[in-house]
Amino acid sequence: MSFSDWINSSYPNPGIDGQWRWLHITVLIFCIGLIVAFALIFRKRSLKTRKIVLWCLVGTILFFEITRRIINLVKMNGGGNFNDYLYTLLPRPWCAIACWSIIIATVFNKKFLYNFASMTALLCALVFFAYPGAGFNNQYILFENLYSISTHSLLLVTSISLITLKFTRFEYKNIWKEGICLAVILAYVFLEIYGLKIESDPMYFMPGNDVMDIFGVGYSTYLAIYIIFVIIYFNVFYLIDDRKNVVARFKHKNNLDNDEESRKSYEIIKNVLNSKLI
């Protein structure tokens, strides 16, 4: 195998069942080790130090994203139409979109962007490591395999590190900002599918996708499960991080309900007494 074969991923690479084998498990353990190490070492360090750690992670993601695009452009050798270039240059699947969400969040340094990026990147990473459809499933680790394994590993480490290193703050009062981010991503995804026609199912909600086949259910049932899961998944972050306000609101509502019940009881007793006096 030459370097050209490796970098262009052109060397014959038979498929294997690599899920939950030694490489898959080793990479996952390594990622968990990095997450724990970053949290223990850098959590209480200065913001400047924590940003250096973040930029190192994001810089590595950016390196893989740019390198892959350069390689694919070189392979095109000036051929192809406009759509082929869009297919090569734009982030298409959800995982690639998550990579660029993290990059954009770090560049603009906004809390709500960190929030959204960490949630969506973590989901992509968890799905990949639970059921990897690429990367581990070939005999050789060519560049495309390395890209897939590395970017998903970086998504896992970076998404959790954004939380442990205190770049995120999930509050229900600001959830509308993350909601706008999700709406923008959905609009981009529909543009990919129906407008640009460069990806058939970036977020795995269209009929006939691999995840639906795993569940073995009809599309209507799958879509309902998908929507419910996404709602619950995103709310978990707020229920944990904003739990004090959630509990306070719950107690306040209970107090209001109790006050209302007391007022109604008082009115009933008052009316009964008045009727007896009359």
Predicted feature locations:
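Hydrophobic core of alpha-helical transmembrane segments in multi-pass integral membrane proteins
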Residues: 24-43, 58-67, 183-190, 227-239
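Short, highly charged, low-complexity non-transmembrane loops/tails of multi-pass membrane proteins
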Residues: 244-277
